[in-house]
């Protein structure tokens, strides 16, 4: 049975039992700041389990895209080395939100595995929670009883909390687990006579985990039974496919066959003939899948957070490609094999094919360049270490090459061996462990606001806010809750900061890149200045403000009034953003995708994918086309419809947004169509004017445009014109002559700088000739030890070069100081390096000025922070040279 058939059979099985088949959420959990990646099927239902979000169904089934690389769940280093570890995988799961519980969950799992999948009943085991005295919980006898309907007692095993109890955090929903295992036979395992379920080998393979969410763990650790227990299950598709297809590893399933075939075609290597090269094939296949799905869901390579993990995944695959002889870009072709093989389940991959392959190819080219730079650095450092007499490559250098340049450790080790160098493996391992710890502790999430317990409680009680701000900027409503410092309160006196929740509001809560509204809330005896508005999960809109006067109370009827001018300016910028997005795709190409945005009353910022700097002509064309659409003055059309219906119209859905079944489509007829919950103008002509103020690169393959619309754009052009006229006045030229006049001034300045450098060089040459007359002879060798005037080490080097031009044979030791810094330089002509080593000499004298340094046999530099000891250092150099010459 193919993996695609297993996936379909699973979803069909649960659909027939009243489950809603829910589409996989993004592998990037944009609405959960606690997670780096979606790592389990329950992630998209987390707020439902917490009672913060209601769904139109109470049982669901999914095949969820998951990623485990970075953060707490990190399988990256094990990938390719084991039969089961992956960075990207699919998790099959069924869920109950207060509907069925243990009895049905056990029955469904048993029937699917034994009847639909045909797994042998006599090979299956089940585990249950053995209980926990600290949690005051006994063994899960209820689950044991249900399993006893299908399994003999000796194949129902108890395991401790660390294996068979699941919790969402230190507090909140939690409960015991049951795992289903299959005995694959003694030939698969470790061969030990006492091998049994729980052994680390693959004989007793964990297939399916059933979590019985039946408790709410309180802050004091007590377990309170949930009023509506729930079910969360997970089974890896790759793992169950390996069992059903009777292959030794997940990588031998049909899921990975297209990638293995493509790698064989590109490299000429036949999988299964060399264990070490097989590891590389597995790594490339796995990482190619991960990269395709990550980029498809909106991740881009960068040096932090999710983008950094993606970059590491890509570069790890590329390094393994080199082990197979793949020196040219190849991973984008493996990614195409992924997309084509997964198109039935994930058609969105093929839709983004050009974009995904372009991102990967761009990163491959950058990596090859980086690898070349790293190779040069390694060669230079080995040369320096040899000159200094060192025999070991430091761990810090290895780590820099590995972390900064993505340099393969094997290449470093091989080069070291060829040159009779050792490698500081312990130092490198220590730095790697520190990096892993920092990755676990300090990864950057999605930046979403954490929801306080007060709001979780409100959601659980069914409190929500109805937004009426599309149609009106003022409304009357009732105060449903007041929150101060994360705690719900009954009232808020004058002068206090407060967060206000009402039953309905015209205030737009920050979402989709648009900032929250500002305005006032007026009560019977109070007035609140609203400085921001937030949209929280569970349809809660929170007004953040300060009580200006009076006392605000829960239950009061209040008047909510949005600042009309600010809302209007925000609307202009939001509609302008839609125009800009559409124009960018027309001018630059369909590969342009939104990578982030900010829409405010005073400006807009739009981040998008593009792989080259935007030329001045392109930028002018972008600005012209946006303004052309403004002048056309098109009517905006806003419609609500089903998500599938909207997508069929070609509406653009943004990967960072989470959409419900009903969506709002904003259309500028004939020009733009996007899913958007923000506020807009009625006609494009309302924008008036659009001006780009800045364009820049913010990451590899990501550009940013900042722009102004409406009166803000007009103000900007007015200020710009004022500055232009001021500059024209200073230059005594007309406004249109300013650029030409500045070009002439810059050309004159450049010529004068060249003349100045020539004069300096002439003076230095003359000074060098004068100083050279003061050289003394020591043992038949000309030696110049002197304190000179030089602003920095570079000037000192230039002076030394002048001496070398005039000295056919000799040694120079020069010293200079600038402020609280002292500089030393030792130069030795090639014929004398066997008698005087510049690097060794400078190490001996630099200690005098409280510094350090080194260098080659013929030239070395050093610096220190005790300039008052400079003459002592020079005297020591003179003394040492007399002894050695």
From Swiss-Prot:
EC number: 6.1.1.7
SUPFAM superfamilies per record: Class II aaRS and biotin synthetases (SSF55681), Putative anticodon-binding domain of alanyl-tRNA synthetase (AlaRS) (SSF101353), ThrRS/AlaRS common domain (SSF55186), Translation proteins (SSF50447)
Keywords from the named record: Aminoacyl-tRNA synthetase, ATP-binding, Cytoplasm, Ligase, Metal-binding, Nucleotide-binding, Protein biosynthesis, RNA-binding, tRNA-binding, Zinc
Record has Magnesium as a keyword: no
Molecular function via GO: alanine-tRNA ligase activity; aminoacyl-tRNA deacylase activity; ATP binding; tRNA binding; zinc ion binding
Cofactor: Zn(2+)
Reaction equations catalysed: tRNA(Ala) + L-alanine + ATP = L-alanyl-tRNA(Ala) + AMP + diphosphate
Record-level GO cellular component terms: cytosol
Cofactor mode of binding and number, as noted: Binds 1 zinc ion per subunit.
Positions that bind Zn(2+): 574, 578, 676, 680
Function: Catalyzes the attachment of alanine to tRNA(Ala) in a two-step reaction: alanine is first activated by ATP to form Ala-AMP and then transferred to the acceptor end of tRNA(Ala). Also edits incorrectly charged Ser-tRNA(Ala) and Gly-tRNA(Ala) via its editing domain.
NCBIfam families from the UniProt entry: alaS
Comment, domains: Consists of three domains; the N-terminal catalytic domain, the editing domain and the C-terminal C-Ala domain. The editing domain removes incorrectly charged amino acids, while the C-Ala domain, along with tRNA(Ala), serves as a bridge to cooperatively bring together the editing and aminoacylation centers thus stimulating deacylation of misacylated tRNAs.
Similarity comment text for this entry: Belongs to the class-II aminoacyl-tRNA synthetase family.
The name this protein goes by in its record: Alanine--tRNA ligase
């Amino acid at each position: 049975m193919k993996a695609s058939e297993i996936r379909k059979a699973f979803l069909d099985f649960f659909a027939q039992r009243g489950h809603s088949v829910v589409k996989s959420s993004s592998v990037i959990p944009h609405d959960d700041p606690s997670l780096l990646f979606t790592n389990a099927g329950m992630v998209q239902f987390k707020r439902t389990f917490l009672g913060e979000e209601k769904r139109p169904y109470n049982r669901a089934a999914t095949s969820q895209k998951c990623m485990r690389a970075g953060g707490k769940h990190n399988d990256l280093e094990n990938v390719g080395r084991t039969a089961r570890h992956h960075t990207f995988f699919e998790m099959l799961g069924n869920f109950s939100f207060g509907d069925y519980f243990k009895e049905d969950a056990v029955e469904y799992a048993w029937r699917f595995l034994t009847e639909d999948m045909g797994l042998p009943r006599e090979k299956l085991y089940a585990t249950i929670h053995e209980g926990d005295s600290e949690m005051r919980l006994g063994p899960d006898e209820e689950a044991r009883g249900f399993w006893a309907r299908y399994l003999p007692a000796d194949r129902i095993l108890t395991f401790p909390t660390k294996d068979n109890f699941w919790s969402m955090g230190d507090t909140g929903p939690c409960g015991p687990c049951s795992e289903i295992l299959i005995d694959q036979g003694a030939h698969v395992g470790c061969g030990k006579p006492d091998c049994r379920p729980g052994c680390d080998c693959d004989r007793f393979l964990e297939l399916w985990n059933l979590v019985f969410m039946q408790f709410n763990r309180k802050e004091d650790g007590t377990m309170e039974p949930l009023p509506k227990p729930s079910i969360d299950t997970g089974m890896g598709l790759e793992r169950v496919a390996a069992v059903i297809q009777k292959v030794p590893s997940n990588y031998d399933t049909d899921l990975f066959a297209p990638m293995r075939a493509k790698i064989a075609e590109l490299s000429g290597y036949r999988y299964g003939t060399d264990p070490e090269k097989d590891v590389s094939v597995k790594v490339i296949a796995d990482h190619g899948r991960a990269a395709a799905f990550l980029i498809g869901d909106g991740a881009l390579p960068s040096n932090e957070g999710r983008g950094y993990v993606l970059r590491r995944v890509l570069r790890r695959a590329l390094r393994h490609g080199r082990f197979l002889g793949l020196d040219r870009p190849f991973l984008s072709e493996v990614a195409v094999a992924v997309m084509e093989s997964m198109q039935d389940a994930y058609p969105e991959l093929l839709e983004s094919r050009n974009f995904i392959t372009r991102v990967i190819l761009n990163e491959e080219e950058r990596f090859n360049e980086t690898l070349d730079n790293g190779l040069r650095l390694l060669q230079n450092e080995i040369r320096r270490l040899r000159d200094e007499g060192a025999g070991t490559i430091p761990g810090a250098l290895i780590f820099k090459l590995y972390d900064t340049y993505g340099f393969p450790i094997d290449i470093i080790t091989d080069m070291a061996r060829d040159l009779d160098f050792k490698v500081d493996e312990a130092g490198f391992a220590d730095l790697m462990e520190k990096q892993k710890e920092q990755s676990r502790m300090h990864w950057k999430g999605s930046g979403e606001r954490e929801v306080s317990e007060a709001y979780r409680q409100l959601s659980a009680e069914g409190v929500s806010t109805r937004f009426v701000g599309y149609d009106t900027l003022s409304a009357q409503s009732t105060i449903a809750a007041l929150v101060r410092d994360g705690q719900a309160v009954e009232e808020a006196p004058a002068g206090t900061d407060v967060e206000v929740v009402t039953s309905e509001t015209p205030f737009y809560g920050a979402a989709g890149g648009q900032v929250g509204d500002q305005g006032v809330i007026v009560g019977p005896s109070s007035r609140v200045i609203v400085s921001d508005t937030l949209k929280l999960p569970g349809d809660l809109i929170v007004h953040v403000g300060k009580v200006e006067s009076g006392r605000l109370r829960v239950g009061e009827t209040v008047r909510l009034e949005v600042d009309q001018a600010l809302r209007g300016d925000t609307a202009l910028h939001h509609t302008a953003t839609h125009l800009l997005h559409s124009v960018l795709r027309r001018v630059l190409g369909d590969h342009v995708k939104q990578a982030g945005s900010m829409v405010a009353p005073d400006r807009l910022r739009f981040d998008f994918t593009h792989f080259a700097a935007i030329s001045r002509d392109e930028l002018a064309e972008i600005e012209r086309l946006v303004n052309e659409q403004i002048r056309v003055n098109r009517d905006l059309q806003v419609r609500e419809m089903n998500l599938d219906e909207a997508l069929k119209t070609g509406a653009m859905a943004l990967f960072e947004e989470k959409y419900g079944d009903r969506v709002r489509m904003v259309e500028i007829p004939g020009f733009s169509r996007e899913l958007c919950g923000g506020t807009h103008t009625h006609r494009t002509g309302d924008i008036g004017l659009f001006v780009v103020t800045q364009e820049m690169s913010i990451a590899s393959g990501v550009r940013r445009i900042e722009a102004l619309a409406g009166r803000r754009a007009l103000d900007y052009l007015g200020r710009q014109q004022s500055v232009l006229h001021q500059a024209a006045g200073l230059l005594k030229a007309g406004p249109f002559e300013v650029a030409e006049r500045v070009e002439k001034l810059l050309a004159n300045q450049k010529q004068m700088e060249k003349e100045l450098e020539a004069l300096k060089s002439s003076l230095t040459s003359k000074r060098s000739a004068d100083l050279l007359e003061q050289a003394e002879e020591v043992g038949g060798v000309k030696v110049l030890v002197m304190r000179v005037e030089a602003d920095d080490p570079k000037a000192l080097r230039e002076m030394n070069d002048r001496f070398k031009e005039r000295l056919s044979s000799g040694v120079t030791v020069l010293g200079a100081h600038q402020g609280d810094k002292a500089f030393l330089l030792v130069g030795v002509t090639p014929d004398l390096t066997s008698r005087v080593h510049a690097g060794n000499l400078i190490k001996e004298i630099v200690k005098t000025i409280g510094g350090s340094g080194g260098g080659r046999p013929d030239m070395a530099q050093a610096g220190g922070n005790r300039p008052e000891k400079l003459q002592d250092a020079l005297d020591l150099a003179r003394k040492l040279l007399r002894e050695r010459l």
